[in-house]
């Protein structure tokens, strides 16, 4: 949702606009740089309840009931489509975060049989650790540069575009660079 950094701009858009106005008064142009369709793990779209319109790719099925403390998550289906490395850059599936119901879980590895997520951190990214029933869907959250991505087939892309355009226009930016 691209919230304004209140550490740097304590009054939100008002502070941001004041900074841009000072730059303009000094004869400078001001640009906005962003990673397009990326959502930070500390964003309100992630915590405390993940927005269902975050991009997911691999899917599995929970093999057994688990409680909120379980650190080995069993799958009834093979996990060969789930990544084994953290997210950086590239076209391959990356990132080690899964979504079950409304809980994000970070896994550190997959067992040799490819049927369990191991060394899991429950209630990851500000979500709440919770019990889950066998048969629940396990979704892999697509990640790049430590951020989740927006599913561009959903209305979330339009909401974020409106948010970004609104801040751009209200604060008086001169240009925007869409990265990523």
Label each residue range with its predicted role.
Residues 1-59, 142-180:
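Aromatic-lined carbohydrate-binding/catalytic grooves of carbohydrate-active enzymes
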Residues 4, 20, 39, 66, ...:
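Weak global preference for isoleucine
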Residues 44-122, 126-129:
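Autoprocessing Asn-cyclization modules and mimics
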């Amino acid at each position: 949702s691209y919230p304004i950094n209140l550490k740097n701009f304590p009054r939100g858009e008002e502070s941001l606009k004041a900074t841009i106005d000072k730059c303009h008064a000094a004869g400078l142009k001001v640009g906005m740089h962003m990673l397009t369709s990326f959502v930070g793990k500390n964003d309100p779209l992630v915590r405390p309840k993940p927005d269902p319109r975050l991009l997911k790719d691999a899917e599995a099925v929970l093999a057994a009931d688990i409680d909120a403390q379980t650190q080995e998550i069993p799958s009834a289906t093979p996990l060969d489509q789930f990544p084994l490395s953290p997210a950086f850059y590239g076209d391959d599936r990356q990132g080690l975060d899964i979504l079950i119901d409304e809980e994000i879980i970070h896994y550190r590895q997959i067992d040799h049989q490819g049927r369990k997520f191991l060394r899991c951190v429950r209630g990851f990214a500000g979500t709440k650790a919770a019990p889950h029933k066998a048969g629940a869907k396990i979704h892999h959250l697509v990640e790049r540069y430590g951020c989740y991505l927006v599913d561009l087939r959903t209305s979330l892309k339009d909401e974020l575009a409106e948010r970004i355009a609104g801040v751009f226009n209200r604060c008086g930016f001169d240009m925007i660079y869409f990265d990523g």
